[in-house]
Amino acid sequence: MAWWEAGARILLAILIGLAIGYERERRNKPAGTRTHILVCLGAALIAVMENYVEARVLAINTDVLNTGVAVSMGRISAQVVSGIGFLGAGTIFSSRKKIAGLTTAASLWCAGCLGLVAGMGCYTLA
């Protein structure tokens, strides 16, 4: 992957986080622009790094299928999804039959997923 492509992926993630965060901040909701940008950016950086590591592993060992070495593509990204879910759980509050923060948790989780999608280079999907 060229440096400019990694930069484009990261920039796209920042713009996605900005759009989601701006909408949340405009409505005076918790977890605004900075939080959504950071979640989206962090997820995109992990995706770019994972893509780089996968390319390096496959370049070093082109006979990866014949040697029995198992390369698990997507393992790091899966941990990002569960980690952001854990972060979102911290934004949910319940008191006296009222639950608050579900939309904030969902928006953080979606921002992280969209950051992963942008970081993987699926521009049209993001």
Regions inferred by a protein language model and the residue ranges of each:
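Loop-to-transmembrane alpha-helix initiation sites
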Residues: 6-9, 121-126
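Alpha-helical transmembrane segments in inner-membrane proteins
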Residues: 9, 15-16, 85, 92-98, ...
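Alpha-helical transmembrane segments and their membrane-interface boundaries
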Residues: 1-68, 72-74
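Short, non-helical or kinked segments that cap or interrupt transmembrane helices
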Residues: 26-39, 72-81, 95-110
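Small-residue-rich segments of transmembrane alpha-helices in multi-pass membrane proteins
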Residues: 38-48, 106-118
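Phosphate-handling active-site elements
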Residues: 56-60, 99-100, 122-124
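Hydrophobic, membrane-facing alpha-helical anchors
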Residues: 57-58, 75-91
